Every structure is written in structure tokens, then in C-alpha cells.
Design a protein with these regions (language model features):
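Walker A/P-loop
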Residues: 124-145
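Conserved Walker A/P-loop ATP-binding site and its immediately adjacent core
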Residues: 147-172, 462
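SF2 helicase catalytic motif II
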Residues: 205, 220-223, 238, 323-367
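Post-DEXD/H (motif II) to motif III coupling segment of the RecA-like Helicase ATP-binding lobe
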Residues: 346-407
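A conserved SF2-helicase RecA2
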Residues: 391-405, 549, 553-585
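Conserved interdomain hinge at the start of the Helicase C-terminal
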Residues: 422-460, 467
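Conserved helicase ATPase core of P-loop NTP-dependent helicases/translocases
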Residues: 476-514
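Conserved RecA-like helicase motor core of SF1/SF2 enzymes
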Residues: 516-555, 574
Length: 585
């Protein structure tokens, strides 16, 4: 009989799957296949063409017979299917309920599915909660915290825009002994953790703490030797020691060069001290003071360059020590947390996988997402870290229940069809610089604004936003990313919020880039125009979710607030690639 030994992060097969070595090897291969996924476009790989690779990546390590614990259910079902005798031994330590917090939703009642989600989270201990935009993930998360009652908790968010917003909402609803709690935060230059409570951390900050970084282009996590900065800590220490040495030498040289002035100052002080006549004493003291000022001025001039170099080196060293301290605090928090929860868990599966490995002590592992699937087949990585989907609440469910407004989706055909030798040329000619398409966007945007419908336009390229801003009356283009590579400053975040308020008041037509795809709280926006040509169903669901929120608790109140529905405008072109993208959306 084989034993499945379950731990928080990884599980292990102990014993033989079969006494016959050949059959045993075949069964291990079956486990490898069961815990694998097909790599898109693998058929173009040389190893695949040469028969050296089957085009799949497995999460099962055959050499040491381990796999992510979120996949135990798959292994158990496989063993039952193959009639392999097995037992499950759970060696995890369940944490004590050491953080009895409560929720104060300010008179609001949780919806039934939010209660169910929070109950299932505690019961299953790990899993994905598929809650669409508008389902109330923040309040659901707070109820989960109350049900689990453990600390510390790490709550991962994918972008800097969500960091303070999430912290603020948690502090708004959570109570300890009747008082509002202090929620820890790390990211965007902030690091104020609560080792005995709940903490919100960006995944970029969490990765940096372990000297890792995420490469979006290759969709992988790699070591980051320069995570602390372009210079190593040893190099900064050497520079500080050298600067200190040079400053000492400069001080000695200045003292030597100013020896005569120093002697004059010493004599002047001596004469002043000995003088008994008050009037003469005052005159001598004034002369001594002037000599002291002259001495200090000339000395500062002589050591100015070396002093500045020392201060610069000391500041760099102090900053590095602060960075190392903060990284250590984040590492300790993640390594010791009792609950590891990821918001927007679909964003980067390899990041979740890496951080899940580091959260070795996390008994509870949960993910929240409105779109818990990926275009690259890597959902199994998310499942391995966080577990299978335990509840699903779709936009259709909430529309039927009256918690979201119904969408009206229109696809506008564009007859202008321009060629191009490469895809960037095709995109530029048919999307960015397509006069017919852009003019129709202008007509739609201005018409909806005039009709009193706050309108959002989501572009994929900055140059496209610039063009549309110049064409559309009252349009304001607010560019920016969403991956945390170039985190917005507080001023930029405040500007975005002001522009969101302006579009909600129908003062402007807002044109935005991917920063507005997720985490934007602007329920009054009633119209969405999609001028780009993305082919990701995940992105499309996120974008459409921006305009489905009710203005108020339900559709009836939303109708009273002049938002009975949401209108989404998309475009269809006859160019082969772009037409395919539209069909996928």
C-alpha cells in the first residue's frame, strides 16, 4: 500500500505503487501525466519535433515522488480509478484560533453566496473562490478572516493600485474587541507589517523579499541578484569604508593646513579667558568667535567634497540596511503565516506557485478570482498551490439575482481593411490608425456622453489613446500599466481617482489603459468601448466587469439612479487575425 503524506505546501508518495518494477514505473508515469498540462504551441519546439518531449509540463517530481498538496484530490481519484491501494496521512498542524476578530459591515447584510463562500473556505481549508466582479470579494474576505480566526494572515494583491484600497476596506470592516484593527501593508515603498494580524502585500514585494522577480514576457519567476539595487551590499559597505577613510584624511589635512589659524584661535580663546575687564573680555571673545567662524568655513571648504561623498555613501548604506530589514520582515511573515490568501489569483500562476512554496506554515490556502482560468493551461499550477474551485458565482448568476445590471453587447463591423507585413503593422494600420474605426469610436463616445451615460474607453496602446483623446470632445487619456513594473506615484493614483470621479459625473469621457482593467471602483460608468483587439477571455471578462456594477445594492435601486443596464461596444474587422481575436472575445 502506498501512503500519500500531506503537508501544507507539498505532498509525497511513500512506498511502491506496484511490486513489479516495470508496472511501478508505468504507474508513476500515469501520475506524471495526471499532474501535467499541455504547453500551447509545444509542437513548434525542436525537442517536441525530435520526439524528446511530449509537449507537457508536470508538477509531479518522479525522482523524489512529491507534488503540490492542492493536487492530492487528483492523485486520490487516479489511485481509485487504477485500483491502487493507498492511505492518506495528514501531517499538517492545524493552527489554534488565536485572532478572534469580528466583522462590522455598517448595516449591510452578507449575500447568501458570500456566507457560503466563507463557510466553505474554513471547511475545505484550501480552494479557489470564483467570485465575479461585483460579487463582493472584500466583504467575503473579511467574513473568511472572522471564520478562520487565525493570525498572521498574508493577503496577496497583484497591483499597487489595490494595495491601499484593500487595506482601507479591511480596516473599515474588521474589529478586534470592538475596535478597528490595524492591517499590515507592504509594497509601493511601504512596509508596516502586523505579525499578529492581517497583512496586505503586493506579489512584487513578496517576490523581492526572496530575491526573486517575475518576467511577464517569459511567464516565469527567476532569481534577481540585483533586487536590492544595482550595487551589492558588500560594494556599498566597501564604498562607505572608503568614503569614511577619505573623510578622516581630509580632516587631518585640513587641520594641518589651517594649523596657524587654529593656533590663533587657541590664543584668542586663552586671552579672552584670562581677561578680567568685562569690556575688553567681550572684545576678545568676539575676535575669538570670528576666528572660529573663519576656521570652520575654511575647513568645511577643504573637506566639502569628501564630506559629501561620505554622506552619500552613508545614506546608501542606511537605505540598504532598511531594505534588508524590510525584506527579512516580509520573509518571516510569509514563512510563518497561518493563512495564505491570493486576490485575483489568475494573474500569474508561477508567482502564486513560488510564494505558496515559501508559505510553508500556511494551513489555510485560498484564492479569489472572477476568472480562475488561463489561456496557457496553467490552471493546474494555481490548483496545486491553492486547491480546486470550491464555489462559483458568475456574472450571469448575479444578473439573474439582480445584483449586477444586464449588459447589452454590440459588435460594430468596420469595412476599412488595411494590410501589413507583420502583426505590429497590421495592428497599427487596422486598430491604432484606422480612420473609420476611430471615427466610430468618437461618434459612440460623444453620443453616449450626451445621452448622460458615463463612458470608459479601454485602449491597449498609448499612441491609440493619444489619437482618440485628440478626436473625442471632452476626452481625457490616463495611461499607465497594471503589473507593478512602474508603480504609480501617490500623485498619479490621486489623479486617476479624480478622473474616475469626473467620468462618473459624466464630465469627461475617460480613456484608460490596462490599469483600469481590475480593481477600479466606479459603479456609475454605464458604457464601455473596446477599441483594441485582445484575444484573452480573462481580460475581456475583467474589462466588461468594469461596467456591470449596480449604482446601489441591487438593480432596482440602480434603475432609480439612472443605470438600468450596461452597454459594451466592440468592433469586428475582416483582417484574418483581428477577426479571430474578435470571435474569441
Amino acid at each position: 500500500m502506498v501512503t500519500i503524506e500531506v503537508n501544507n505546501a507539498t505532498s509525497k508518495l511513500i512506498g511502491y505503487l506496484h511490486q513489479d518494477p516495470a508496472v511501478n514505473a508505468q504507474l508513476h508515469e500515469a501520475v506524471r501525466q495526471e499532474l501535467s498540462y499541455e504547453v500551447p504551441s509545444a509542437e513548434w519546439s525542436q525537442k517536441y519535433k525530435q520526439g524528446q518531449w511530449d509537449g507537457r509540463i508536470s508538477l509531479y517530481n518522479k525522482r523524489i515522488t512529491t507534488f503540490p498538496s492542492g493536487l492530492v484530490r487528483r492523485v486520490r481519484q487516479l489511485f481509485e480509478k487504477l485500483e491502487i491501494e493507498h492511505q492518506i496521512v495528514d501531517i499538517r498542524e492545524k493552527p489554534e484560533r488565536n485572532y478572534p476578530i469580528t466583522c462590522d459591515f455598517e448595516g449591510k447584510d452578507l449575500r447568501f453566496y458570500q456566507e457560503n463562500a466563507a463557510t466553505l473556505a474554513k471547511k475545505t481549508q484550501r480552494g479557489m473562490l470564483s467570485l465575479c466582479t461585483g460579487a463582493g470579494k472584500t466583504m467575503t474576505s473579511c467574513k473568511i478572516f472572522e471564520n478562520l480566526a487565525v493570525a498572521p494572515v498574508v493577503f496577496i494583491v497583484p497591483a499597487i493600485e489595490l494595495l491601499k484600497q484593500t487595506q482601507k476596506e479591511f480596516q473599515r470592516y474588521l474589529r478586534f474587541n470592538g475596535e478597528k484593527i490595524e492591517v499590515g501593508i507592504a509594497g509601493g515603498g511601504l512596509c508596516k507589517l502586523n505579525m499578529e494580524g492581517i497583512n496586505v502585500i503586493t506579489y512584487q514585494t513578496a517576490l523581492i523579499a526572496f530575491d526573486k522577480k517575475y518576467l511577464e514576457k517569459g511567464n516565469k519567476v527567476v532569481d534577481d541578484p540585483n533586487g536590492d539595487g544595482p550595487k551589492s551590499t558588500a560594494q556599498l559597505q566597501k564604498e562607505l569604508e572608503e568614503a569614511n577613510k577619505n573623510l578622516i584624511i581630509a580632516n587631518n589635512n585640513a587641520t594641518r593646513d589651517l594649523s596657524k589659524l587654529s593656533l590663533d584661535l587657541e590664543n584668542a580663546n586663552m586671552l579672552s579667558d584670562k581677561e578680567t575687564d568685562l569690556k575688553k573680555k567681550k572684545t576678545l571673545a568676539s575676535a575669538a568667535l570670528n576666528l572660529e567662524k573663519q576656521f570652520n568655513k575654511e575647513k568645511n571648504t577643504l573637506i566639502k567634497t569628501d564630506l559629501a561623498a561620505y554622506k552619500k555613501a552613508l545614506t546608501a548604506w542606511d537605505n540598504r540596511q532598511e531594505t534588508l530589514l524590510q525584506k527579512s520582515q516580509v520573509r518571516n511573515l510569509i514563512s510563518s503565516c497561518n493563512a495564505f490568501i491570493v486576490d485575483e489569483a489568475h494573474v500569474a500562476s508561477v508567482v502564486i506557485e513560488e510564494l505558496g512554496k515559501q508559505a510553508k506554515n500556511a494551513y489555510y490556502r485560498l484564492g479569489l478570482s472572477g476568472t480562475p482560468w488561463r489561456m496557457d493551461n496553467q490552471e493546474i499550477r494555481i490548483e496545486g498551490t491553492l486547491g480546486r474551485k470550491i464555489i462559483e458565482v458568475s456574472a450571469s448568476d448575479l444578473i439573474e439575482l439582480g445584483f449586477l445590471v444586464p449588459p447589452k453587447i454590440f459588435v460594430c463591423n468596420v469595412s476599412e481593411n488595411n494590410g501589413g507585413e507583420t502583426y505590429p503593422d497590421i495592428y497599427s494600420n487596422n486598430i491604432v490608425n484606422n480612420w473609420e474605426r476611430n471615427y466610430r469610436i468618437k461618434q459612440f463616445a460623444e453620443g453616449f456622453k450626451e445621452a448622460g451615460r458615463p463612458t470608459l474607453i479601454l485602449v491597449e496602446r498609448r499612441e491609440h489613446g493619444d489619437i482618440l483623446e485628440g478626436m473625442i470632445e471632452d476626452a481625457v487619456f490616463v495611461p499607465g500599466g497594471d503589473k507593478g513594473v512602474d508603480d504609480p506615484t501617490d500623485e498619479e493614483k490621486n489623479y486617476r481617482r479624480r478622473m474616475l470621479n469626473a467620468v462618473e459625473n459624466n464630465e469627461i469621457v475617460l480613456i484608460a489603459t490596462q490599469w483600469a482593467n481590475v480593481g477600479v471602483d466606479a459603479p456609475k460608468i454605464a458604457t464601455l468601448i473596446l477599441p483594441g483587439s485582445n484575444q484573452s477571455s480573462v481580460t475581456t471578462y475583467q474589462q466588461v466587469g468594469r461596467v456591470l456594477r449596480c449604482v446601489g445594492p441591487n438593480i432596482e435601486v440602480s434603475k432609480q439612479n439612472n443605470k438600468p443596464d450596461a452597454i459594451i461596444i466592440d468592433f469586428m474587422l475582416e483582417q484574418k487575425n483581428l477577426k479571430s481575436h474578435c470571435n474569441m472575445r
